[in-house]
């Protein structure tokens, strides 16, 4: 099997951790970032900067049609960022995003002769997003294999760990400070520790605090 991987890469904490994971697991790593007209272009700038610094082949694919089909708080200024209520999904959920991203990552992987696809989705902290579930990833893996007659393996290194354990993984790679300072998780587009107020920043900070506290014990 080809020892080459394509990493779905946003420039955020999770995908950057997965990028470092892939660099340890595979001989060749390619990063792919999707431009879906997200409000904060800084996300793409972060991904580009990190890929360049690490000397990784990097592709940016235009997925602007996703914004046309599925308006959400990550692409529209007139939609408030808020958690889901009464069983509804959070306003930050982008319908079909992971399905489309992984499908196009699969197309790129096959063209590049890569068998492995890496994504940072996580069921532990999935915030109610249905396309972050393990059952979805396994199902899509089978579908991609059938659709392209190709033996892909979709890897989800973070699937069963929480944010504290994700920080531990980064620390084990010797990259905790790098990921803390250079990645963008914040819904308000602030690099590093972010605004500290949005749901993404709170999840990230709580995980970091929990991990750093565990190191003292």
UniProtKB/Swiss-Prot annotation:
Record's catalysed reaction(s): 7-carboxy-7-deazaguanine + NH4(+) + ATP = 7-cyano-7-deazaguanine + ADP + phosphate + H2O + H(+)
Group of enzyme by EC: ligase
Pathways involved: Purine metabolism; 7-cyano-7-deazaguanine biosynthesis
Enzyme Commission number: 6.3.4.20
TM helices/strands, residue ranges: none
GO molecular function: ATP binding; ligase activity, forming carbon-nitrogen bonds; zinc ion binding
Entry keyword set: ATP-binding, Ligase, Metal-binding, Nucleotide-binding, Queuosine biosynthesis, Zinc
InterPro entries: QueC, Rossmann-like_a/b/a_fold
Binding site for ATP: 9-19
Known cofactor(s): Zn(2+)
Cofactor note: Binds 1 zinc ion per subunit.
Family as reported in the entry's similarity comment: Belongs to the QueC family.
Quaternary state and interactors: Homodimer.
The protein's role, per its UniProt record: Catalyzes the ATP-dependent conversion of 7-carboxy-7-deazaguanine (CDG) to 7-cyano-7-deazaguanine (preQ(0)).
HAMAP family: QueC
Record's protein name: 7-cyano-7-deazaguanine synthase
Protein's organism: Clostridium beijerinckii (strain ATCC 51743 / NCIMB 8052)
